[in-house]
From Swiss-Prot:
PTM comment text: Glycosylation on Asn-177 is required for interaction with Fc receptors and ability to activate the complement pathway. (Microbial infection) Deglycosylation on Asn-177 by S.pyogenes EndoS or Endos2 endoglucosidases prevents interaction between immunoglobulin-gamma (IgG) and Fc receptors, impairing ability to activate the complement pathway.
Annotated region (CH3), positions in chain: 221-327
Subunit structure: Immunoglobulins are composed of two identical heavy chains and two identical light chains; disulfide-linked.
Protein's recorded name: Immunoglobulin heavy constant gamma 4
Domain Ig-like: 6-99, 118-217, 226-322
Coiled-coil regions listed in the entry: none
Transmembrane residue ranges: 348-368
One BP annotation, GO: adaptive immune response
Upper lineage: Eukaryota, Metazoa, Chordata, Craniata, Vertebrata
Length: 396
């Protein structure tokens, strides 16, 4: 999915009960990409009673989340509540005023409910679970905002259109806004998920006008193997107490991938990995940054970036870096440069030697040629000049 700003919808109770001292106001932030999005209330002035739920990745590839604030019922209609949404990747800022449109309070009015009733979300298995045979991949179906009046939820699961019955439904959990959250988990086979089988969760509840169906599967398309590069700390960062080791993973498809760090065989936990970002060629890339104490880096500890993806051989690869490896690389580069200079000087020396030999040879040949010509001229003069002394004697 390309960068997309969110749509923002205010959520408010449609009635007020005299038995309820508080009311819940909500803000639905829908259909945005990529993460993250920031939600505040009254420009950050209202923080008490605020709860923002984690973002949910929809089957469309876009994210949605909701934020709820609990306020005194008596303040509805007299105070203003505004939901402030900021999505920096798309440079989108939205301010939505949440207003409760209710009639006179009456004892028989039900407790405030969210508009639309229960919502259903379907989550894929974690990439690491689908790529390691020792782990168990699961597809998870989550139903939220289930009312106390109709708490029973029925789940039906289908794999490629065929109903299956091995899913497990967890006990419902009561939420802070007096609704229930119900979760059903379906265990799937590794190869079924990787081969693109389609999983459907069908949810039925009396609070719904009709059943809700959600479908999910692995992204279609030819898998592409990721390229992994590790980057040491910059020289500027070496002045600080902690340094950053970076792992660049690029060129992979689909976006399902797992990245972890370890050192000397032990896992490292102080790292952050960006969500996969769609590149111009249709593949994805991401960065993972591990933060370590500078002393550990200077001691020569080896740190490894481990990548798991379906297009890799055995679904796994690892790239390591350490100060000693970087020094060896620098020494190798220096030796290569020295070797290149040595070769250059050798070439120059040979050229100069050959040039001097050529000059000497040419000078020697020229010298002998000049000497020969000079000797020939002298001999010729001696032969041609007449002997005037004999001629005078003969005349006398």
């Amino acid at each position: 999915a390309s960068t997309k700003g969110p749509s923002v919808f205010p959520l408010a109770p449609c009635s007020r009960s005299t038995s309820e001292s508080t009311a819940a106001l909500g803000c639905l932030v829908k259909d945005y990409f990529p993460e993250p999005v920031t939600v505040s209330w009254n420009s950050g002035a209202l923080t008490s009673g605020v709860h923002t739920f984690p973002a949910v990745l929809q089957s469309s590839g876009l994210y949605s989340l909701s934020s709820v604030v609990t306020v005194p019922s008596s303040s509805l209609g007299t105070k203003t509540y505004t939901c402030n949404v900021d999505h920096k990747p798309s440079n989108t800022k939205v301010d939505k005023r949440v207003e409760s449109k209710y009639g006179p309070p009456c004892p028989s009015c039900p407790a405030p409910e969210f508009l639309g009733g229960p919502s259903v979300f379907l989550f894929p298995p974690k990439p690491k679970d689908t790529l390691m045979i020792s782990r168990t991949p699961e597809v998870t179906c989550v139903v939220v905002d289930v009312s106390q009046e109709d708490p029973e939820v029925q789940f039906n699961w289908y794999v490629d259109g065929v109903e299956v019955h091995n899913a497990k439904t967890k006990p419902r959990e009561e939420q802070f806004n007096s609704t229930y959250r119900v979760v059903s988990v379906l265990t799937v086979l590794h190869q079924d998920w990787l081969n693109g089988k389609e999983y459907k969760c069908k949810v039925s509840n009396k609070g719904l006008p009709s059943s809700i169906e959600k479908t999910i599967s692995k992204a279609k398309g030819q898998p592409r193997e990721p390229q992994v590069y590790t980057l040491p700390p910059s020289q500027e960062e070496m002045t600080k107490n902690q340094v950053s080791l970076t792992c660049l993973v690029k060129g992979f498809y689909p976006s399902d991938i797992a990245v972890e760090w370890e050192s000397n065989g032990q896992p490292e936990n102080n790292y952050k990995t960006t969500p996969p970002v769609l590149d111009s060629d249709g593949s994805f890339f991401l960065y993972s940054r591990l933060t370590v104490d500078k002393s550990r880096w200077q001691e020569g500890n080896v740190f490894s970036c481990s990548v798991m993806h379906e297009a890799l051989h055995n679904h796994y690869t690892q790239k390591s870096l350490s100060l000693s490896l970087e020094l060896q690389l620098e020494e190798s580069c220096a030796e290569a440069q020295d070797g290149e200079l040595d070769g250059l000087w050798t070439t120059i020396t040979i050229f100069i030697t050959l040039f001097l030999l050529s000059v000497c040879y040419s000078a020697t040949v020229t010298f002998f040629k000049v000497k020969w010509i000079f000797s020939s001229v002298v001999d010729l003069k001696q032969t041609i000049v007449p002997d005037y002394r004999n001629m005078i004697r003969q005349g006398a």
